[in-house]
Amino acid sequence: MIKDTQSTAENQANETTHFGFKTVAKEEKQQLVANVFHSVAAKYDLMNDLLSFGIHRIWKRFTIDCSGVRKGQKVLDLAGGTGDFSAKFSRIVGETGQVVLADINSSMLEVGRDKLRNLGVVGNINYVQANAEHLPFADNTFDCVVISFGLRNVTDKDKALKSMYRVLKPGGRLLVLEFSKPIFDPISQLYNFYSFNILPKVGGIVVNDAESYRYLAESIRMHPKQDELKTMMEHAGFESVNYYNLSAGIVALHRGYKF
């Protein structure tokens, strides 16, 4: 009887996951996250600038500097959304290289495609609607995979990391730019106040959707801490994994290699 009860509890745990602070069935989370990004896609870039005071551009510049991407290489911009990374990598890899902007959300992908075309970024970029857990690419395809502020929204992060590992070429690297845990308590307290009191209000005013930005704050708190994500990447097969705390750990950049 005890064994049966334990087995039932384990099965239920395996079938559920977090959507912010809520516990939901795994098959529900993907649609719930999709609804969030369908809602915010049109003003996603504006909200990034407002909520980070433009600092997200510095975080992204540092990520590009750490990527080691060169002319002629192939880059996967996963959960690439509105295409900030794709625009930069397109110029770096040049005509002989290729960038794939992949996102599971059709609204985000459409905004990204329109934005890059308006900027004249064409020719070496492909757009693919794809689930990070089941990437539709052959083994050993990319020199670099970048996922920026997307991993925390993935239902099965371990499966997604293994999928990223699979599509990387030997010698390739994965970069994960994501919100993390502040390393100083005073900053953590201020950040918590900002996240739960300011973010939803700004979202309500600008996007008319406070709930999506409340989810943003909650999803950050549920995301693995720096050392936990490092361990997850190592379990997925990545080697020489390290991370950099940016803005006192509000954001962290993890980097790992496939050898």
From Swiss-Prot:
Coiled coil: none annotated. GO terms for biological process: aerobic respiration; menaquinone biosynthetic process; methylation. It catalyses: a 2-demethylmenaquinol + S-adenosyl-L-methionine = a menaquinol + S-adenosyl-L-homocysteine + H(+); a 2-methoxy-6-(all-trans-polyprenyl)benzene-1,4-diol + S-adenosyl-L-methionine = a 5-methoxy-2-methyl-3-(all-trans-polyprenyl)benzene-1,4-diol + S-adenosyl-L-homocysteine + H(+). PROSITE patterns: SAM_MT_UBIE, UBIE_1, UBIE_2. It is an enzyme of class 2 (transferase). Disulfide bonds: none annotated. Its EC number is 2.1.1.163, 2.1.1.201. GO terms for molecular function: 2-methoxy-6-polyprenyl-1,4-benzoquinol methyltransferase activity; demethylmenaquinone methyltransferase activity. Signal peptide: none annotated. The keyword DNA repair does not apply. It comes from the Bacteria. It holds the Pfam family Ubie_methyltran. Pathway: Quinol/quinone metabolism; menaquinone biosynthesis; menaquinol from 1,4-dihydroxy-2-naphthoate: step 2/2; Cofactor biosynthesis; ubiquinone biosynthesis. NCBIfam families: MenG_MenH_UbiE (TIGR01934), PRK00216.1-1 (NF001240), PRK00216.1-3 (NF001242), PRK00216.1-5 (NF001244). Belongs to the class I-like SAM-binding methyltransferase superfamily. MenG/UbiE family. Methyltransferase required for the conversion of demethylmenaquinol (DMKH2) to menaquinol (MKH2) and the conversion of 2-polyprenyl-6-methoxy-1,4-benzoquinol (DDMQH2) to 2-polyprenyl-3-methyl-6-methoxy-1,4-benzoquinol (DMQH2). This is Ubiquinone/menaquinone biosynthesis C-methyltransferase UbiE. It comes from Haemophilus ducreyi (strain 35000HP / ATCC 700724). The lineage of its organism: Bacteria, Pseudomonadati, Pseudomonadota, Gammaproteobacteria, Pasteurellales.
